[in-house]
Amino acid sequence: DDSDCFTPPEPIVMEFVNSKGENLIQNGTLTKEHFHFLQIAGDTKIGTSFEINHESRVILNKPGWIVGSTTYEALVLTKEIKFFNFTVNASKLSGKCGGNKIDNVSFEDIEAHSQNGIYQIVVE
């Protein structure tokens, strides 16, 4: 019975930086109001909630809960508005525990690097 043990999916963690690698939330350039994330479902776009953690990183909790491939649109209100899409592929965990896992995340139209489960996004 899967209900006794359940593993929630890991969140997507993004750190928004400039070309020097400086965290733009930490240095005060960007705040929560500068970000918008939308889940793309056919012709519909649905706002997706996120938070900013104590390490000045954007945390998206929802993507891993959806099995299959889900595309999101991100809007970052920097001096030049940045639009980019990212696609999350998630699958069910195998074994006796229920839950999902994120298999991979791919970014389009933006420079992104993955390190230790954190996606560093270069926006200026």
Residue ranges and their predicted role:
Residues 1-13:
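Bacterial Sec-dependent N-terminal signal peptides
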